[in-house]
Design a protein with these regions (language model features):
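Donor-binding/catalytic cores of nucleotide-activated saccharide
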Residues: 96-188
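Short aromatic/hydrophobic "clamp" motif used to bind/position activated sugar donors
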Residues: 88
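Acidic helix N-cap motif at the loop->helix transition within catalytic regions
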Residues: 21, 35, 46-54, 96, ...
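Short, conserved active-site loop motifs that form the nucleotide-linked donor/cofactor pocket
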Residues: 7, 35, 61-63, 114
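Short beta-strand/loop segment that forms part of the nucleotide-sugar
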Residues: 35-43, 63-68, 92-93
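N-proximal low-complexity "stem/linker" segments adjacent to membrane-targeting elements
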Residues: 1-29
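A conserved acidic beta->alpha catalytic loop
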Residues: 26, 41-50, 68-70
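Glycine-rich, basic loop-to-helix element that forms the pyrophosphate-binding segment
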Residues: 67-83
Length: 188
């Protein structure tokens, strides 16, 4: 693995004072260190911004962008406008990630010469219930029509009569993406 590959991590933040510290702690403590951490404060009215500012003072990899509240999608798009990394990951501010999260996905991309790598995840609930959501197609490479038939249709949805055996959660937060592909296709 080339440790010079900068990875941009976009973290939209809005009124998550209860969770954002754990999120930032998990990102700052990644085993892969060459990170460009972009926090987009989407007009938080609680102490989320102060918590983020405190982390930025301790970690020079963190940049904070302040904007008026416009929702999660626009906060992510604002982050995309500031990406410097070869790859980009999105992490929601009420989530935390395993210490090897970025490194494992980057290894997957490098091993397969891929543009995207998806990860499994766990869902944690306030009642201490934990549900494992493993990646369904470990080490599977999708190309050409398989991307449309297996990945996109599974994410977007299809007619009930159309059988899709690959279901990918409809969110960006469990993957690492090529920044070049995002920019080339103006994906926002």
């Amino acid at each position: 693995m080339n440790s010079s590959d900068l990875i941009s991590v976009i973290i939209p933040v809005y009124n998550v004072e209860k969770y954002v510290g754990s999120c930032l702690e998990s990102v700052c403590n990644q085993t892969y260190k060459n990170l460009d951490i972009i926090i987009v404060d989407d007009g938080s009215k609680d102490s989320s911004n102060k918590i983020c500012e405190d982390y930025a003072l301790k970690d020079s990899r963190i940049r904070i962008i302040h904007k008026n509240n416009a929702g999660l999608g626009l906060a992510r798009n604002t982050g995309l406008e500031h990406v410097k990394g070869k790859y980009v990951a999105f992490i929601d501010s009420d989530d935390f990630v395993a210490a090897n999260y970025i490194e494992a996905m980057l290894n997957g991309i490098k091993r397969s010469n891929a543009d995207t790598c998806y990860a499994g995840y766990y869902e944690y609930y306030d009642d201490n219930n934990i549900i494992s959501k493993p990646a369904r197609y470990d080490s599977t490479i999708f190309t050409n029509n398989a991307i449309i038939e297996k990945v996109l249709l599974g994410m977007i949805g299809t007619e009930p009569s159309y059988k899709v055996d690959f279901i990918l959660p409809m969110s960006v937060w469990h993957a690492l993406y090529s920044s070049e592909i995002i920019q080339q296709h103006n994906i926002k």
